[in-house]
Amino acid sequence: AYVGPKADIGNSAVAKGCEVLGEVKNSVLSYNTQVGEGAVVSYSVLMPGAVVESGAVVQYAIVGENCRIGRDAQVGAPPETAQDPDDWGVAVLGPGTVIGDGEIVPAKTLLDRHHGEVKA
């Protein structure tokens, strides 16, 4: 794994082949994942090949294989942001899902690679 000089990793598992330039807390990064400069990944799991671009925030999420999360995008949210506990849940991105720059994926959302919301 390559950990950049501005990276901040705490209480996380980082596999071989990862590149971490941002902040990773309480998370698991599978092999060949990338976390860009200024990006934050917390309480999340990134599957192999997932990319979190600069400035993006991923919280309480499961990010599938080969997903790409664009610059300054947001995926998931902490539980305390929900007014009703039933309205909160982990955000899940299926394999190959691409989230555009600045896009927001709310908590308790399940998306597939075609960006269709999957109803549980």
Predicted feature residues:
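Left-handed beta-helix
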Residues: 1-120
